[in-house]
Amino acid sequence: MSTTPNIGFISLGCPKNLVDSERILTELRTDGYNIIPSYENADLVIVNTCGFIDSAVQESLEAIGEALEENGKVIVTGCLGAKENQIREVHPKVLEITGPHSYEAVMKHVHKYVPRPERNIYTSLVPAQGVKLTPKHYAYLKISEGCDHRCTFCIIPSMRGDLDSRPIVQVLDEAKRLADSGVKELLIVSQDTSAYALDQSKENQNKTVFWNGVPIKNNLITLCEQLGTLGIWVRLHYVYPYPHVDDLIPLMAQGKILPYLDIPLQHASPKVLKAMKRPGAIDRTLERIKKWREICPELTLRSTFIVGFPGETEEDFQMLLDFLEEAQLDRVGCFKFSPVEGAVATEMADQVSEDVKEERFHRFMQVQQRISAARLQQKVGKTLAVIIDEIDEEGIIGRSMADAPEIDGVVYVDNLSEQEVKVGQVISVSITNADEYDLWGTC
């Protein structure tokens, strides 16, 4: 019988949390622990939680409860871990609780309850890029932690702290390791990607450092330029609409990074945006979108919006629908406002009823589905680069440059056998059909 300790692991939440899970798993593996997908034979279970909205809190609490019931020895980390009292009220038998990105504390607790093995059979087996929970051909790369904004619907800063950017050389080194390991697409994530390095002094931002023998400075534009030298797809997520985002568009037009911008705008009514503490110059946003598309006609714009925010009137909501018609965004996510404990907006007056939220959500989605369908229809007859995600007996599924994994659409590829392509390969596909979300094509 093996004497190697077994650690069960549960990862919940967003891609940023997934990156934290990968970091913890890499350290566990490096220390010689065996990672298993079940509670039954685990010496200890780690639950990496999400606490962004109430439904995520409930999911996390249920996962902790299940781990306690099935195993009994549980360590909790992640965003909900920042609210230790809330967890202990429901689950007092949890061994230890840490907040997000508390890698050293998690490992200290693991060592306390399950001492590291004397003979580490795994060290030589841990890949240079670390343990990854994504398919081998794409990976999330987190460039910073925390956020300096204080949006009234959000509690992320209270859980993850203020902005803390990673050194540019460290980020680029990790990106190169991932590319060298066979990753074909990097998804750049953080709480606020466009704020990268803005937390550092002007002196540090302007200081010249060297990477791969090239002199570089510590800022987002330089980071993207250097990522563009790796010869793989680079996709930006969570880009707050700072003015300097305009400088990214030429890099997309030049093919250095993917022509894809995930930019959460949240609303279009100046009154609602002010209440959210978000940028409110929506006319300026429309002008920027027009300019971006002139510079980079292939640009895909994704955004997210909240309907039913406290104080949102029918007039405010109509402004949002009008904005959708004018902006003609490619991909859109919509969320009904959800009260979150600790968020300023939760205590605001004029809360919108659930019935009205639901009705506005459906009206919003009807408008955007029509827009998305029309924009996808424009791709019929074109030839697109498609990265292959899945190959099975039912067919071949991939994504175009306009599609991020899990949140966007896919491309179904016909008349191609399993023997002709492999997962992670980028192929040219002629688009023959489209609906509101997905494309179909042939090689």
Curated annotation (Swiss-Prot):
<dbReference type="Pfam" id="PF18693">
    <property type="entry name" value="TRAM_2"/>
</dbReference>
<dbReference type="InterPro" id="IPR005840">
    <property type="entry name" value="Ribosomal_uS12_MeSTrfase_RimO"/>
</dbReference>
<keyword id="KW-0808">Transferase</keyword>
<comment type="function">
    <text>Catalyzes the methylthiolation of an aspartic acid residue of ribosomal protein uS12.</text>
</comment>
<dbReference type="InterPro" id="IPR013848">
    <property type="entry name" value="Methylthiotransferase_N"/>
</dbReference>
<dbReference type="Pfam" id="PF00919">
    <property type="entry name" value="UPF0004"/>
</dbReference>
<dbReference type="InterPro" id="IPR005839">
    <property type="entry name" value="Methylthiotransferase"/>
</dbReference>
<protein>
    <recommendedName>
        <fullName>Ribosomal protein uS12 methylthiotransferase RimO</fullName>
        <ecNumber>2.8.4.4</ecNumber>
    </recommendedName>
</protein>
<dbReference type="InterPro" id="IPR023404">
    <property type="entry name" value="rSAM_horseshoe"/>
</dbReference>
<dbReference type="GO" id="GO:0006400">
    <property type="term" value="P:tRNA modification"/>
</dbReference>
<dbReference type="GO" id="GO:0005829">
    <property type="term" value="C:cytosol"/>
</dbReference>
<feature type="binding site">
    <location>
        <position position="151"/>
    </location>
    <ligand>
        <name>[4Fe-4S] cluster 2</name>
    </ligand>
</feature>
<dbReference type="GO" id="GO:0046872">
    <property type="term" value="F:metal ion binding"/>
</dbReference>
<feature type="binding site">
    <location>
        <position position="154"/>
    </location>
    <ligand>
        <name>[4Fe-4S] cluster 2</name>
    </ligand>
</feature>
<dbReference type="InterPro" id="IPR020612">
    <property type="entry name" value="Methylthiotransferase_CS"/>
</dbReference>
<keyword id="KW-0949">S-adenosyl-L-methionine</keyword>
<feature type="binding site">
    <location>
        <position position="79"/>
    </location>
    <ligand>
        <name>[4Fe-4S] cluster 1</name>
    </ligand>
</feature>
<feature type="binding site">
    <location>
        <position position="14"/>
    </location>
    <ligand>
        <name>[4Fe-4S] cluster 1</name>
    </ligand>
</feature>
<keyword id="KW-0963">Cytoplasm</keyword>
<keyword id="KW-0411">Iron-sulfur</keyword>
<dbReference type="GO" id="GO:0035599">
    <property type="term" value="F:aspartic acid methylthiotransferase activity"/>
</dbReference>
<keyword id="KW-0004">4Fe-4S</keyword>
<dbReference type="GO" id="GO:0103039">
    <property type="term" value="F:protein methylthiotransferase activity"/>
</dbReference>
<dbReference type="InterPro" id="IPR012340">
    <property type="entry name" value="NA-bd_OB-fold"/>
</dbReference>
<feature type="binding site">
    <location>
        <position position="50"/>
    </location>
    <ligand>
        <name>[4Fe-4S] cluster 1</name>
    </ligand>
</feature>
<keyword id="KW-0408">Iron</keyword>
<dbReference type="GO" id="GO:0051539">
    <property type="term" value="F:4 iron, 4 sulfur cluster binding"/>
</dbReference>
<dbReference type="InterPro" id="IPR038135">
    <property type="entry name" value="Methylthiotransferase_N_sf"/>
</dbReference>
<comment type="similarity">
    <text>Belongs to the methylthiotransferase family. RimO subfamily.</text>
</comment>
<dbReference type="InterPro" id="IPR002792">
    <property type="entry name" value="TRAM_dom"/>
</dbReference>
<feature type="binding site">
    <location>
        <position position="147"/>
    </location>
    <ligand>
        <name>[4Fe-4S] cluster 2</name>
    </ligand>
</feature>
<dbReference type="InterPro" id="IPR006638">
    <property type="entry name" value="Elp3/MiaA/NifB-like_rSAM"/>
</dbReference>
<dbReference type="InterPro" id="IPR007197">
    <property type="entry name" value="rSAM"/>
</dbReference>
<dbReference type="Pfam" id="PF04055">
    <property type="entry name" value="Radical_SAM"/>
</dbReference>
<feature type="domain" description="MTTase N-terminal">
    <location>
        <begin position="5"/>
        <end position="115"/>
    </location>
</feature>
<keyword id="KW-0479">Metal-binding</keyword>
<feature type="domain" description="Radical SAM core">
    <location>
        <begin position="133"/>
        <end position="374"/>
    </location>
</feature>
<feature type="domain" description="TRAM">
    <location>
        <begin position="377"/>
        <end position="443"/>
    </location>
</feature>
